[in-house]
Curated annotation (Swiss-Prot):
Organism from which the protein derives: Borrelia garinii subsp. bavariensis (strain ATCC BAA-2496 / DSM 23469 / PBi) (Borreliella bavariensis)
Biological process, per Gene Ontology: negative regulation of translation; translation
Name of the protein in its database record: Large ribosomal subunit protein uL13
Lineage: Bacteria, Pseudomonadati, Spirochaetota, Spirochaetia, Spirochaetales
Coiled coil region boundaries: none
This protein's record includes keyword Ribosomal protein: yes
Function summary: This protein is one of the early assembly proteins of the 50S ribosomal subunit, although it is not seen to bind rRNA by itself. It is important during the early stages of 50S assembly.
GO molecular function: mRNA binding; structural constituent of ribosome
Length: 154
């Protein structure tokens, strides 16, 4: 008869994980598809030891956020709402006006909406750096450039 042993589940601690930096060019890519790929990397779902309640994901740098595109007529019809917290203080912007005022905001809003709500989501969002132009200030991190098919990240 075999001796029965207790199997122990090993939990990876966030401090022991070495975070990589990825560079994504958002020029001429659909807003939602870029956001889905970025959130997957931020959460760490591309890793074998993914755990939903820990920050085991990597850091992401997005360039050319102002050149992201939308399908259909969403450029004029998509609305973004914000409130001043005063009575009657609801404001709305279209994608076009918001991207003229803050070029990185539509992509950041889409990514933030896909992350978990709460302290973990706020920590994950801090791992994201978005730049409207083609230059970024994080060259010292030696980011790995990802091409169009981001679902193949290992």
């Amino acid at each position: 008869m075999k001796k029965i042993t207790n199997n122990v589940t090993i939990w990876i601690k966030p401090k022991t994980v070495e975070k990589k930096w990825y560079l994504i060019d958002a020029a001429d890519r659909v807003l939602g598809k870029v956001a889905v790929d970025v959130v997957r990397i931020l959460r760490g779902k591309h890793k074998a030891y993914y755990t939903p309640h820990q920050d085991l994901g990597d850091n992401v740098i997005i360039i050319n956020a102002s050149k992201v595109r939308l399908t259909g007529k969403k450029h004029q019809q998509k609305l973004y709402y914000r409130h001043s917290r005063y009575p009657g203080g609801l404001y709305s912007d279209t994608f076009k006006t918001l991207s003229e005022r803050k070029p990185c905001a539509p992509l950041e809003i889409a990514i933030k909406g896909m992350l978990p709500k709460g302290p973990l989501g706020r920590d994950l969002f801090r791992n994201l750096k978005v730049f409207s132009g083609s230059e970024h200030t994080l060259k010292a991190q030696n980011p790995i450039k990802l091409e169009a098919n981001l679902r193949e990240v290992k």
